[in-house]
Amino acid sequence: MGCIKSKQECNLHKTIRLKRNKENDEMHNKEKVCLVQANQEDSKFCSCTASPLLLEYAHRLSEDIVNKAVRQWAEVDSKYSDIPYIESDAV
């Protein structure tokens, strides 16, 4: 009795898994179609210019990110600068 019941449950799980795989494939195909359509529309209407205000903001933001990264690197480097680097010939 247990064997028959487990086989029935196994078939049910297999059916559910197949349905999910089919739904995932359909969603993936729809996403691809949307991306292709969006790329085609973008290429038709792209003026390829950005506003100077946006460019200035992006430039300031990138400088800020770089400055923070350099500061963070300097802090970490100063913490561990007293630890000597040991080279090893073992490879």
Curated annotation (Swiss-Prot):
One Pfam family assigned to this protein is SmAKAP
Covalently lipidated residues (N-myristoyl glycine) read G2
Instruction: State the GO CC annotations.
Output: plasma membrane
Q: How is it modified after translation?
A: May be palmitoylated at Cys-3.
Domain of life per record:
Eukaryota
What GO terms are given for molecular function?
protein kinase A regulatory subunit binding
InterPro entries, from UniProt?
Small_membr_AKAP
- Which cystines does this chain contain? none
* Localization, UniProt: Cell membrane
Task: Say what the protein does.
Answer: Binds to type I regulatory subunits of protein kinase A and may anchor/target them to the plasma membrane.
Q: What is this protein called?
A: Small membrane A-kinase anchor protein
Give the originating organism. Answer: Xenopus tropicalis
